[in-house]
Amino acid sequence: HFETLAAAAHSRLVTAGNTEDDLASLSTCDLVIEAIIERIDAKQALFTKLEAILPPHAIVASNTSGLRIKEMMEGRTEAFKKNFLVMHFFNPVRYMKLLELVRGPETSDETANAVETFGRDILGKGIVWGKDTPNFVGNRIGVHGMMATIGAMLEMGLSPEDVDNITGKPMAHPG
Protein backbone atom coordinates (compact mmCIF):
# COMPACT_ATOMS: atom_id res chain seq x y z
CA HIS A 1 0.00 0.00 0.00
CA PHE A 2 2.82 2.44 0.86
CA GLU A 3 4.47 1.79 -2.50
CA THR A 4 1.24 2.73 -4.28
CA LEU A 5 0.97 5.94 -2.25
CA ALA A 6 4.62 6.79 -2.89
CA ALA A 7 4.20 6.18 -6.63
CA ALA A 8 1.12 8.42 -6.71
CA ALA A 9 2.93 11.19 -4.84
CA HIS A 10 5.94 10.87 -7.14
CA SER A 11 3.78 11.03 -10.26
CA ARG A 12 2.47 14.42 -9.11
CA LEU A 13 6.05 15.72 -8.89
CA VAL A 14 7.16 14.58 -12.32
CA THR A 15 5.70 15.98 -15.51
CA ALA A 16 6.66 14.69 -18.93
CA GLY A 17 7.61 17.35 -21.43
CA ASN A 18 9.94 18.27 -24.25
CA THR A 19 12.36 21.09 -24.90
CA GLU A 20 10.33 22.58 -27.72
CA ASP A 21 6.90 22.91 -26.10
CA ASP A 22 7.51 22.80 -22.36
CA LEU A 23 10.79 24.61 -21.66
CA ALA A 24 9.04 27.63 -20.14
CA SER A 25 7.73 25.42 -17.32
CA LEU A 26 11.31 25.31 -16.00
CA SER A 27 11.45 29.09 -15.52
CA THR A 28 10.96 28.88 -11.75
CA CYS A 29 13.21 25.88 -11.07
CA ASP A 30 16.08 26.01 -8.61
CA LEU A 31 17.82 22.96 -10.12
CA VAL A 32 17.67 21.57 -13.65
CA ILE A 33 19.40 18.27 -14.43
CA GLU A 34 19.99 17.93 -18.16
CA ALA A 35 19.95 14.39 -19.56
CA ILE A 36 19.81 14.64 -23.34
CA ILE A 37 21.82 13.04 -26.15
CA GLU A 38 25.59 13.01 -25.62
CA ARG A 39 26.41 15.63 -28.26
CA ILE A 40 28.11 18.93 -27.49
CA ASP A 41 26.01 20.86 -30.03
CA ALA A 42 22.72 19.59 -28.57
CA LYS A 43 23.77 20.36 -25.00
CA GLN A 44 25.04 23.84 -25.93
CA ALA A 45 21.75 24.61 -27.72
CA LEU A 46 19.74 23.52 -24.67
CA PHE A 47 21.94 25.53 -22.30
CA THR A 48 21.39 28.63 -24.46
CA LYS A 49 17.63 28.16 -24.07
CA LEU A 50 17.89 27.47 -20.34
CA GLU A 51 20.08 30.50 -19.72
CA ALA A 52 17.41 32.71 -21.29
CA ILE A 53 14.58 31.51 -19.02
CA LEU A 54 16.04 30.38 -15.68
CA PRO A 55 16.29 32.63 -12.63
CA PRO A 56 19.85 33.85 -11.91
CA HIS A 57 20.24 31.55 -8.87
CA ALA A 58 19.21 28.36 -10.71
CA ILE A 59 21.72 25.53 -10.80
CA VAL A 60 22.10 23.60 -14.04
CA ALA A 61 23.70 20.16 -13.91
CA SER A 62 24.52 17.87 -16.80
CA ASN A 63 24.10 14.12 -16.45
CA THR A 64 26.73 13.61 -19.14
CA SER A 65 28.80 10.50 -18.70
CA GLY A 66 31.95 11.97 -20.13
CA LEU A 67 31.70 15.21 -22.12
CA ARG A 68 34.06 17.95 -20.96
CA ILE A 69 32.60 20.88 -19.03
CA LYS A 70 34.90 23.30 -20.85
CA GLU A 71 33.32 22.33 -24.18
CA MET A 72 29.75 22.35 -22.85
CA MET A 73 30.25 25.86 -21.42
CA GLU A 74 31.47 27.51 -24.63
CA GLY A 75 29.34 30.60 -25.22
CA ARG A 76 27.85 30.66 -21.70
CA THR A 77 27.99 33.67 -19.39
CA GLU A 78 30.10 33.72 -16.23
CA ALA A 79 26.88 33.69 -14.19
CA PHE A 80 25.73 30.48 -15.88
CA LYS A 81 29.17 28.86 -15.47
CA LYS A 82 29.27 29.52 -11.72
CA ASN A 83 25.96 27.66 -11.32
CA PHE A 84 26.93 24.70 -13.51
CA LEU A 85 28.44 21.30 -12.79
CA VAL A 86 28.10 17.64 -13.72
CA MET A 87 25.87 15.22 -11.78
CA HIS A 88 26.77 11.86 -13.29
CA PHE A 89 24.24 9.28 -12.11
CA PHE A 90 24.95 5.58 -12.61
CA ASN A 91 22.34 3.19 -13.97
CA PRO A 92 20.00 1.93 -12.80
CA VAL A 93 19.71 5.21 -10.89
CA ARG A 94 17.19 3.97 -8.33
CA TYR A 95 19.55 1.16 -7.24
CA MET A 96 23.03 2.60 -7.73
CA LYS A 97 24.15 4.75 -4.81
CA LEU A 98 27.07 6.33 -6.63
CA LEU A 99 26.78 9.94 -7.81
CA GLU A 100 29.87 11.44 -9.40
CA LEU A 101 30.03 15.23 -9.22
CA VAL A 102 32.40 17.25 -11.37
CA ARG A 103 33.07 20.96 -10.98
CA GLY A 104 34.01 23.25 -13.80
CA PRO A 105 36.75 25.84 -13.31
CA GLU A 106 34.12 28.54 -12.67
CA THR A 107 31.71 26.47 -10.53
CA SER A 108 31.13 28.33 -7.27
CA ASP A 109 31.67 26.71 -3.88
CA GLU A 110 28.05 27.53 -3.05
CA THR A 111 26.83 25.58 -6.10
CA ALA A 112 29.13 22.63 -5.40
CA ASN A 113 28.10 22.47 -1.73
CA ALA A 114 24.38 22.75 -2.52
CA VAL A 115 24.49 19.93 -5.08
CA GLU A 116 26.60 17.71 -2.83
CA THR A 117 24.12 18.22 0.03
CA PHE A 118 21.15 17.56 -2.27
CA GLY A 119 22.74 14.38 -3.65
CA ARG A 120 23.73 13.02 -0.25
CA ASP A 121 20.88 14.15 2.00
CA ILE A 122 17.87 14.25 -0.33
CA LEU A 123 18.74 11.60 -2.92
CA GLY A 124 20.66 9.33 -0.52
CA LYS A 125 23.64 8.99 -2.87
CA GLY A 126 27.26 8.31 -2.07
CA ILE A 127 29.14 11.30 -3.47
CA VAL A 128 32.50 11.18 -5.21
CA TRP A 129 34.14 14.22 -6.76
CA GLY A 130 35.63 13.54 -10.17
CA LYS A 131 37.81 15.61 -12.45
CA ASP A 132 36.85 17.22 -15.74
CA THR A 133 38.62 14.60 -17.81
CA PRO A 134 37.14 12.54 -20.66
CA ASN A 135 34.67 10.06 -19.12
CA PHE A 136 35.45 11.40 -15.63
CA VAL A 137 36.61 8.91 -12.99
CA GLY A 138 33.80 6.35 -12.61
CA ASN A 139 33.69 5.35 -16.26
CA ARG A 140 37.46 5.38 -16.69
CA ILE A 141 37.95 3.03 -13.73
CA GLY A 142 34.80 1.03 -14.43
CA VAL A 143 35.82 0.06 -17.95
CA HIS A 144 39.13 -1.34 -16.65
CA GLY A 145 37.30 -3.42 -14.03
CA MET A 146 34.88 -4.69 -16.67
CA MET A 147 37.71 -5.64 -19.04
CA ALA A 148 39.59 -7.44 -16.24
CA THR A 149 36.41 -9.36 -15.34
CA ILE A 150 35.86 -10.40 -18.96
CA GLY A 151 39.51 -11.45 -19.23
CA ALA A 152 39.25 -13.57 -16.08
CA MET A 153 35.99 -15.10 -17.32
CA LEU A 154 37.61 -16.18 -20.58
CA GLU A 155 40.80 -17.38 -18.89
CA MET A 156 38.88 -19.52 -16.38
CA GLY A 157 36.33 -20.81 -18.87
CA LEU A 158 33.40 -19.26 -17.02
CA SER A 159 30.09 -18.36 -18.60
CA PRO A 160 28.60 -14.85 -18.39
CA GLU A 161 25.96 -16.34 -16.08
CA ASP A 162 28.70 -17.66 -13.75
CA VAL A 163 30.23 -14.20 -13.57
CA ASP A 164 26.82 -12.57 -12.97
CA ASN A 165 26.17 -15.03 -10.12
CA ILE A 166 29.48 -14.06 -8.51
CA THR A 167 29.67 -10.34 -9.23
CA GLY A 168 25.98 -9.44 -9.37
CA LYS A 169 23.60 -9.35 -6.43
CA PRO A 170 25.98 -11.15 -4.01
CA MET A 171 28.30 -8.13 -4.40
CA ALA A 172 25.40 -5.62 -4.22
CA HIS A 173 25.35 -4.94 -7.95
CA PRO A 174 21.83 -4.74 -9.36
CA GLY A 175 20.68 -7.78 -11.29
Which role does the model predict for each range below?
Residues 18, 65-67, 89-92, 132-135, ...:
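Glycine-rich beta-alpha junction loops
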Residues 9, 33, 53:
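Catalytic or ion-coupling anion/metal-binding cores of large enzyme and transporter domains
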Residues 78-80, 98-133, 143-175:
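Internal alpha-helical scaffold of NAD(P)-dependent oxidoreductase catalytic cores
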Residues 1-30, 40-41, 45:
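Conserved N-terminal Rossmann-fold NAD(P) cofactor-binding segment
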Residues 34, 38:
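Residues immediately C-terminal
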Residues 15-17, 33, 61, 85-87, ...:
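Hydrophobic/aromatic beta-strand patches that form the interior of the parallel beta-sheet core
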Residues 39-119:
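Rossmann-fold NAD(P)-binding glycine/threonine-rich loop
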